Amino acid sequence: MKALKSRGVALAVLVVVVVAGALYGLSRKPISVEYAKWIADDAGLLTAETQQSLKDYNENWNDKYHAVVAVATVDSTHRWSAERYAAMLGKAWGLGQNDMLLLEVKGDHYYVLLGDSVNQTATDTQIAKLKNAIEKNYYDGEYDGATLQFFRTADVVYAQMSQMSQR
């Protein structure tokens, strides 16, 4: 018991815990995405047809608004909050201020990460519409329908934000 009261032992235990935590954190690498495709369907929630539709939307938005909506489907966030996991992916993927990231966790929940410009420009009504677009289908397990409806709504939101910025 005296050994546990020693500062040297306490410091050694602290170092071991910090190193172990750091190694554990580093071992969980984010899923990868191909630049300019922005769809990483690791959980297999989306059909090829849906993925192609999403890519078409992104190409159009990138040309018109310099914006994309990246999509990540995962089986788990590895005990991270969806918000933190989405932020990590957004940073790792190099998403910009005009972009959004839709994170879908299979059988669990989703999270939408907004780029700084979107977050500052979109109205509360527009953000509510984005949320409402995905809710029902997503929680009914209709991931294709939920994702496509989110993109349709995002198309309207991007157009409205573009009109507001041109005024």
Predicted regions and their residues:
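A structural boundary signal for the start of the first folded domain, especially the loop/turn
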Residues: M1-R167
